[in-house]
């Protein structure tokens, strides 16, 4: 952010309007300014009656002239290539720009390359997919029929689209195919959309740009009460209304009484989300209206329609529930039902007293219930599912393998071991076979044979099927009683010895039952394979699972009657034999016949499985496939990452393999001890001057004011770097990444002091303009910024912030971390140490607080420490703790000679932000402590407000100035932030490698390095963590990095991209400073268990989750070449506390990631599925380790089947990491660490997860950070008291700066030194914060005496000088009035009242400029050439006859031509006395100073004080009651010179209206009674003879309420 330019509202194109192709769509209808009631009189473009802004230059009222001008422009465009930059005349030049000046003097201005900038880039034709915002806005305002071919609705469908990222429209025949059928522009935009807040920002600025300024500016759309939209309800676009009253993508507000959050579709605003507004009917900020345009909060009018029901001021306390505080939905009802047996009074007995604690406990029990259910489900799938669906399968014995100790009967195998035949028949007591076993006795030897024919069952299923031919009763038997061998052939048969059995024993054998009162044992079924059934030597068939031996039908006894089918079956028939005949039997209705066959011919059962058993096997193998697949893919992808990708990331030095191995060995040695310094070769030496004379560097600028035109040539195109961005076609056309800030043609925002074309850098002055602009504070001893060609590592540098969050660390820990960051090899000109001390706390055993420790490590403070005051900001807390205060100390890092040798002590800028708390918490144990997340949001929100120019607190204003004063770089130049914990030591080249990755690939939005353990062998607790750290990086993160989706960037060592370049036209996309990320990450209403675990314990991982959710197509990477070391817990108690926080936050963050639909991949082959498996695996860790131990123990038990598959799976899971170590790092020592880790698996997978789940409602940091006097019962984030926003004032940077300068006396209260330029162009043109007075604010007069600050002393100008320069010169000098007050510049007008407050508001409401302050021309009322010896009073230029006019870099003055210079020439002594000031005039047109023609207005920088409006005359602006005339003596008459001059020009035409400049956005503050958006009115134009119109004598009578009169003492 340029401290002298108005910050951009978004990364919007700035200059000119969007040119159309010659064959493009017809011109769209004009945009009616929201809130205006007038309609266009001209169908093409005509001003509404109540249009509160000045029409843009070149506006013609006649339609024919408009059409003629458009046709000329289209003919010029048709001669250009489509992708070529538009000609200067193809766009409406911004007011006050150099292009407008050229258009006024020359019909063919010199074409040049446009300046590329983040803030206000030269606008190329925007390439969109679908309708542009302008077309949509025109559609909203168009009242014509949809069928009208000239209506804007038709234009909506004809918008040309050429966005290669979003696909191409159908009529773009230059492309053969569309990239994607997904149309992001057709998404439903509601508050749940991942880019809801960011798109509202963009839409908000579109409305403001189209309205020529900040019409109806609302408070921040990402702050404490998001107000989505800028235009009032009913402005013509209200027909397309989205959630919250806002138009999806356009940001139109709804009715003022609609609750914020979106028409009931979003959760209502709860406690803590109230707007930082003021009381009703009071001014929004504390300064008076003379120093800012204000929006007054007015009550809703009682006339007209009856007002609707008001919104409660605090929606969070309007409703409460008996179940629990906070939101109550299905989840909370489930938790309450689950714990209904534990009412509140019962919980209070056990110390759970507050309703918030009881809610957290109930939610914890609900989660434990779900976790238990999931573990039970996993156990059921592992062990119980097979038993349930498959059951206990009977034992089966394959036919042909039955031993001699058993016999088969009707398909069942019976054991005859120990069987003694009863004493009947041949086995009688008096026979030789008494008490023998027939299976072993001759002649039977029936062992292994089929004895079914010995126990034939007569009747039953065969009744009526087989009968005697002669009739009568059932036959005695069907077959002869013989034995049958297993191959189906006959066995022993003796007709003389009866072998048939009758009685009950027959039924028992036929049914396969266990014989009663017998030693026979049923073993199981006899099974046959399908190859046995299809054997052509046998006649077998299968019916309902039973195998039938059809050959036995040949042995049927004679005299039996049976169906003819049996005659067919007893001979082998391919239609029946060898097949499953079940279906054929059912079709032919032969069930009875085959049931009889099953009774008499069954020999066994087909070897098959039930459907349940099949399902169990499918489940088993699918699980194996997924588990083994994921494990194997992770392993191979990690190997691929280690072999082919990891060494390329950040390898800017193109190291060889030997160099990489040497560096890895040095890092391993360095990581053994936390205090061991890195090898000296990696740490750069500090530069020392060898002479007492100052040495000038070609990169440094000792005095920014000494730069002259042509001091630096533009960077040659041959210096362009070939990055991934340029290869993809998104690089800057001038080379490198799109520049955003630094003032280098084609440079990044990193090259900050190199002057060129950019318009967003704080040092963005053009060398052509001769000097830098003015800075708000003098700069002393800042580190010079190198030029764009300075590439020490082969890539363009990017400004980076090294953020260190400190809480209760020791002195040694902080010194170690800051030493490592300060001695990194990254240039000090592009890095800033930022230490945020989270409260005034003392660590256990420490005598001084953490902020004091940090302050003791600083030197050369910009402001002495004793003079630093605390400033308020809105903290991330609840209750009164939302108000917090900070002290900002800016200086340089102070080394300790005992830790860093002098030769390595570089000069590094450092800022300390110490949270000191409010006076209410001065006596607490931790005043100012708000948590690490608050420290991160403090920086993120600040960067967002800087990028979007939103209202900021006093702390953020001081933070902005501190960064500027200590670095000389504006905060918006910073692109990367490195987050480091205060107990971490960074390897010297780690920052350079991280920045190299982000510069090379703009799609990377975050990355982390490898964290090594410095105390590996201290205790057994540290030893078990070594391999766990290693494998989490080189396997888990390496696998995720292959897809660019690392799900956890550790907070101890990670880098994030603040903003990313977008396209070749200088646009920037906020990443870390994105409104959606800041809005969700700064959630202060943490009232559910899920939110508390996300935001209070796992804030680092949640930030990664938010970035992946918001930007799922961007990359999160792991860079193993960037290394740090840290101290891990060395006692089990601390480890238990740490892992409790990590495990619980992991569970809740993985749940958030599972809900992201846009992660790469599809279904099972997606990162979302991998995340789901990780979430399930984390929840069932205790059950998994229990099952693992069960499988291992079972494998060693005898007589138990060995679980082969689970053992193989276990070996793969545990063994592959060891193989990974060997094949990637070749660090054999880690194999030993792996064995130690395997022995500690019960601790990692059972003890720690169970402890974490049971303490999920504990939100304290436990033993990890011990603070003196801390109450262990206090949970982090508890609400206490009520937040009072009246102590916090929020203003825009320009308002703070204006107030500071007024109070300090640097400028008069009405100075437009920091005025903000506004234009009426639909696309905001030009830069924003330009000075319209002389940039040399301390040298208003070119002659005379000056004080020590460079200010002109009273009466310093001699009369001769005054007469030489004409009557106007005396008006410019900063002389003092008799009362001692400094007189203000005559050429600088006063601010005026807002339009609705002025007495003549109704007369000028039709065409007055909205919120403008006019910069008048010189006293001459004619555009005739000025006298050659007169200078512009507002610029304080030197006379044409100045003795210094022919100095270096200055052009001679021709007669009749007025000249100017941005900075008057001064000698060296003046420059030394004068405070160093940096640039602010980031001009898009860096041409050298030239002669100004007689018809041109005087131009300063790129702000022209004259613009012509052919259709607007001064007569349209009547006299005003409150004027803004320069201060003159009302009784004084015009001097003779004036009279003569006015008389000479009395016949000249009336001077065109001077263009005004809007100071600030002044938007209303939301209230329960609605908001009436107040617009600032315009001052009237000056009359032809301004000298004849003195201002009223009473200068205070017309001041608005609350405004302080000017001081005259």
Curated annotation (Swiss-Prot):
Q: Where is the composition biased (Low complexity)?
A: 61-82, 253-267, 742-752, 1568-1588
Chain ranges sitting on the Extracellular side read 348-364, 646-1176, 1224-1227
| UniProt induction comment | Expression is slightly lower in the yeast form than in the mycelium and shows a maximal expression in the log phase at about 14-18 h of incubation.
Q: Which residues cross the membrane?
A: 327-347, 365-385, 625-645, 1177-1197, 1203-1223, 1228-1248
Give the signal peptide as a residue range, or say none if absent: none
Listed Polar residues bias regions: 34-44, 100-111, 147-163, 1502-1514, 1530-1552
Membrane topology listed for this record: Multi-pass membrane protein
Keywords of the record, alphabetical order, are: Cell membrane, Cell wall biogenesis/degradation, Cytoplasmic vesicle, Glycoprotein, Glycosyltransferase, Membrane, Transferase, Transmembrane, Transmembrane helix
Which Pfam families does this one have?
Answer: Chitin_synth_2, CHS4
Protein name in the entry: Chitin synthase 5
Q: What is its main location?
A: membrane
Q: Where in the cell is it found?
A: Cell membrane; Cytoplasmic vesicle membrane
Q: Which reaction does it catalyse?
A: [(1->4)-N-acetyl-beta-D-glucosaminyl](n) + UDP-N-acetyl-alpha-D-glucosamine = [(1->4)-N-acetyl-beta-D-glucosaminyl](n+1) + UDP + H(+)
Q: Which GO terms describe its molecular function?
A: chitin synthase activity
Alphabetized Gene3D superfamilies for the sequence? Spore Coat Polysaccharide Biosynthesis Protein SpsA, Chain A
GO annotation (BP), single: chitin biosynthetic process
Q: Which residues are glycosylated?
A: 654, 1015, 1144
What is the similarity comment for this entry? Belongs to the chitin synthase family. Class IV subfamily.
GO CC, alphabetical:
cell periphery; cell septum; cytoplasmic vesicle membrane; plasma membrane
């Amino acid at each position: 952010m340029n401290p002298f330019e108005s910050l951009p509202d978004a990364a919007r194109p700035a200059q000119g309007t969007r040119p159309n192709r010659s064959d493009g769509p017809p011109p769209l209808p004009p945009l009616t300014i929201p809130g205006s009631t007038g309609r266009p009189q001209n169908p093409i473009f005509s001003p509404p009656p109540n249009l509160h802004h000045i029409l843009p230059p070149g506006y013609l009222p006649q339609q024919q002239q408009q059409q003629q001008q458009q046709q000329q422009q289209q003919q010029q465009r048709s001669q250009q290539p489509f992708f070529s930059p538009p000609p200067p005349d193809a766009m409406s030049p911004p007011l006050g720009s150099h292009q407008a000046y050229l258009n006024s003097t020359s019909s063919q201005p010199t074409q040049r390359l446009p300046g590329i900038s983040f803030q206000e880039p030269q606008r190329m034709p925007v390439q969109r997919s679908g309708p542009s915002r302008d077309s949509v806005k025109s559609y909203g305002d168009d009242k014509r029929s949809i069928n009208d071919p000239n209506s804007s609705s038709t234009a909506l469908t004809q918008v040309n689209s050429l966005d290669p990222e979003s696909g191409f429209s159908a009529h773009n025949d230059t492309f053969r195919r569309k990239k994607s059928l997904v149309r992001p522009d057709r998404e439903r935009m509601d508050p749940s959309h991942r880019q809801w807040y960011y798109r509202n920002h963009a839409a908000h600025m579109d409305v403001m740009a189209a309205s020529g300024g900040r019409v109806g500016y609302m408070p921040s759309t990402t702050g404490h009460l998001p107000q989505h939209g800028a235009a009032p309800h009913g402005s013509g676009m209200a027909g397309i209304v989205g959630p919250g009253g806002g138009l999806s993508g356009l940001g139109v507000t709804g009715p003022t009484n609609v609750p914020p959050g979106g028409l009931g579709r979003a959760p209502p605003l709860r406690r803590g989300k109230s707007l930082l507004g003021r009381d009703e009917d009071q001014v929004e900020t504390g300064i008076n209206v003379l120093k800012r345009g204000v929006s007054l909060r007015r009550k809703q009018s009682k006339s007209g329609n009856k007002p609707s029901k008001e919104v409660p001021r605090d929606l969070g306390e309007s409703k409460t529930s008996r179940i629990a505080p906070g939101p109550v939905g299905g989840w909370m009802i489930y938790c309450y039902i689950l714990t209904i047996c534990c009412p509140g009074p019962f919980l209070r007995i056990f110390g759970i007293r507050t309703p918030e604690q009881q809610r957290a406990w109930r939610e914890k029990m609900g989660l434990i219930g779900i976790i238990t259910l999931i573990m039970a489900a996993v156990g059921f799938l592992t062990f119980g599912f097979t038993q349930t669906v498959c059951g206990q399968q009977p034992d089966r014995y394959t036919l042909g393998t039955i031993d001699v100790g058993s016999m088969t009967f009707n398909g069942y195998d019976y054991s005859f071991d120990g069987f003694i035949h009863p004493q009947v028949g041949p086995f009688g007591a008096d026979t030789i076979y008494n008490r023998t076993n027939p299976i072993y006795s001759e002649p039977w030897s029936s062992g292994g044979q089929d004895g079914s024919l010995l126990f034939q069952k007569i009747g039953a299923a065969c009744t009526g099927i087989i009968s005697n031919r002669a009739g009568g009763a059932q036959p005695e038997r069907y077959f002869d009683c013989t034995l049958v061998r297993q191959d189906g052939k006959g066995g022993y048969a003796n007709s003389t010895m009866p072998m048939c059995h009758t009685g009950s024993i027959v039924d028992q054998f036929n049914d396969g039952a266990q014989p009663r009162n017998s030693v026979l044992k049923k073993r199981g079924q006899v099974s046959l394979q399908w190859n046995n059934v299809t054997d052509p030597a046998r006649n077998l068939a299968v019916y309902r699972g039973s195998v039938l031996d059809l050959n036995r039908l040949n042995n049927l006894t004679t005299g039996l009657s049976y169906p003819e089918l049996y005659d067919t079956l007893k001979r082998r028939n391919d239609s029946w034999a060898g097949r499953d005949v079940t279906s054929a039997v059912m079709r032919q209705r032969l069930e009875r016949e085959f049931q009889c066959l099953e009774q008499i011919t069954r020999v066994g059962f087909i070897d098959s499985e039930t459907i349940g058993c099949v399902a169990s096997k499918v489940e088993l193998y699918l699980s194996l496939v997924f588990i083994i697949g994921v494990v194997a893919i992770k392993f191979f992808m990690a190997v691929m990452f280690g072999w082919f990708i990891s060494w390329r990331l950040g390898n800017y030095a193109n190291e060889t393999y030997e160099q990489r191995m040497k560096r890895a060995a040095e890092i391993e040695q360095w990581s053994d001890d936390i205090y061991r310094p890195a090898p000296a070769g990696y740490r750069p030496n500090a530069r020392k001057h060898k002479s007492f004379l100052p040495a000038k560097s070609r990169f440094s600028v000792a005095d920014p004011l000494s730069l002259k035109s042509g001091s630096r040539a533009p960077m040659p195109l041959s210096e362009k770097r070939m990055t991934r961005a340029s290869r993809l076609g998104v690089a800057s056309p001038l080379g490198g990444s799109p520049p955003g800030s630094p003032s280098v043609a084609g440079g990044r925002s990193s090259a900050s002091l190199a002057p060129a074309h950019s318009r967003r850098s704080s040092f963005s002055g053009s060398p052509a303009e001769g000097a830098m602009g003015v800075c708000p504070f003098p700069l002393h001893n800042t580190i010079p910024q190198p030029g764009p060609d300075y590439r020490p590592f082969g890539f363009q540098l990017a400004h980076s912030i090294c953020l260190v969050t400190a809480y209760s660390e020791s002195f040694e820990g902080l010194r170690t971390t800051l030493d490592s960051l300060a001695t990194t090899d990254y240039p000090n000109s592009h890095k800033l140490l930022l230490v945020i001390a989270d409260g005034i706390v003392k660590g256990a055993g420490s005598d001084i607080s953490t902020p004091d420790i940090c302050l003791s490590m600083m030197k050369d403070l910009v402001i002495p420490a004793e003079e630093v005051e605390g400033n308020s900001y809105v903290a991330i807390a609840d209750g009164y703790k939302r108000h917090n205060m900070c002290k900002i100390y800016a200086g340089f890092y102070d080394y300790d000679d005992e830790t860093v040798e002098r030769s390595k002590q570089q000069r590094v800028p450092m800022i300390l932000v110490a949270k000191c708390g409010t006076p209410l918490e001065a006596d607490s144990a931790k005043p100012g402590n708000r948590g690490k997340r608050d420290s991160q949001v403090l920086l993120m929100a600040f960067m967002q407000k800087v990028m979007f120019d939103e209202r900021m607190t006093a702390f953020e204003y001081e933070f902005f100035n501190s960064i500027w004063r200590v670095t000389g770089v504006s905060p918006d130049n910073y692109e990367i932030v490195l987050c480091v914990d205060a107990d971490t030591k960074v390897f010297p080249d780690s920052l350079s490698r991280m920045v190299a990755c982000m510069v090379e690939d703009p799609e990377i939005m975050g990355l982390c390095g490898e964290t090594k353990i410095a105390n590996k062998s201290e205790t057994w607790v540290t030893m078990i963590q070594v391999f766990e750290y290693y494998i989490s990086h080189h396997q888990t993160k390496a696998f995720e990095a292959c897809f660019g989706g690392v799900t956890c960037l550790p907070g101890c060592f990670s880098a994030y991209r603040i903003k990313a370049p977008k396209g070749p036209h200088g646009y920037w996309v906020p990443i870390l400073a994105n409104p959606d990320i800041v809005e969700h990450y700064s959630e202060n209403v943490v009232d559910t268990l899920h939110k508390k675990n996300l935001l209070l314990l796992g804030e680092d991982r949640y930030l990664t989750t938010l970035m992946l959710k918001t930007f799922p197509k961007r990359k999160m990477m792991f860079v193993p070449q960037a290394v740090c070391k840290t101290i891990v817990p060395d006692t089990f108690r601390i480890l238990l506390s740490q892992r409790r926080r990590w495990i619980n936050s992991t569970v809740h963050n993985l749940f958030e990631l599972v809900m992201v639909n846009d992660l790469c991949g599809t279904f099972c082959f997606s990162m979302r599925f991998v995340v789901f498996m990780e979430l399930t695996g984390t929840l069932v860790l205790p059950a998994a380790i229990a099952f693992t131990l069960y499988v291992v123990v079972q494998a060693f038990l005898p007589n138990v089947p060995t679980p082969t598959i689970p053992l193989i799976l276990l070996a793969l899971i545990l063994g592959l990491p060891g193989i990974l170590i060997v094949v990637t790092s070749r660090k054999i020592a880690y194999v030993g660490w792996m064995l130690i880790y395997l022995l500690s698996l019960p601790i990692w997978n059972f003890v720690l997860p169970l402890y974490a789940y049971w303490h999920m409602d504990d939100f304290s940091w436990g033993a990890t950070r011990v603070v003196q006097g801390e109450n262990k019962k206090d949970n982090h984030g508890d609400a206490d008291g009520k937040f009072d926003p009246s102590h916090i004032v929020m203003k825009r940077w320009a308002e703070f700066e204006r107030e500071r300068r007024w109070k300090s006396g640097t400028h008069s209260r009405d100075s437009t030194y920091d005025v903000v330029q506004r234009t009426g162009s639909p696309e905001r043109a030009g830069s924003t914060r330009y000075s319209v007075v002389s940039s040399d604010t301390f040298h208003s007069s070119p002659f005379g005496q000056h004080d020590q600050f460079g200010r002109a002393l009273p009466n310093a100008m001699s009369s001769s000088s005054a007469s030489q320069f004409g009557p106007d010169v005396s008006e410019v000098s900063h002389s003092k009035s008799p009362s001692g007050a400094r007189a203000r510049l005559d050429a600088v007008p006063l601010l005026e009242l807002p339009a609705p407050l002025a007495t003549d508001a109704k007369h000028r409401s039709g065409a007055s400029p909205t919120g403008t302050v006019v910069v008048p021309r010189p006293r001459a009322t004619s555009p005739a050439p000025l006298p050659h010896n007169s200078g512009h009073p507002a610029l304080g230029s030197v006379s044409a006859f100045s003795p210094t006019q022919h100095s270096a870099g200055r052009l001679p003055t021709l007669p009749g031509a007025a000249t100017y210079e941005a900075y008057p020439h001064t000698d060296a002594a003046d420059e030394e006395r004068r405070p160093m000031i940096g640039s602010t005039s980031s001009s898009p047109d860096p041409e050298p100073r030239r002669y100004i023609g007689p018809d041109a207005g005087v131009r300063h920088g790129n702000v022209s004080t004259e613009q012509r409006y052919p259709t607007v005359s001064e007569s349209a602006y009547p006299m005003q009651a409150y004027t803004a005339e320069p201060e003159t003596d009302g009784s004084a008459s015009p001097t003779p010179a004036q009279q003569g001059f006015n008389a000479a020009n009395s016949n000249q035409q009336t001077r065109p209206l001077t263009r005004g400049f809007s100071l600030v956005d002044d938007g209303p503050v939301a209230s329960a009674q609605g908001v009436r958006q107040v617009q600032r009115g315009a001052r009237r134009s000056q009359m032809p003879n301004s000298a004849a119109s003195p201002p009223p004598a009473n200068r205070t009578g017309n001041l608005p309420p609350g405004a302080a009169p000017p001081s005259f003492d």
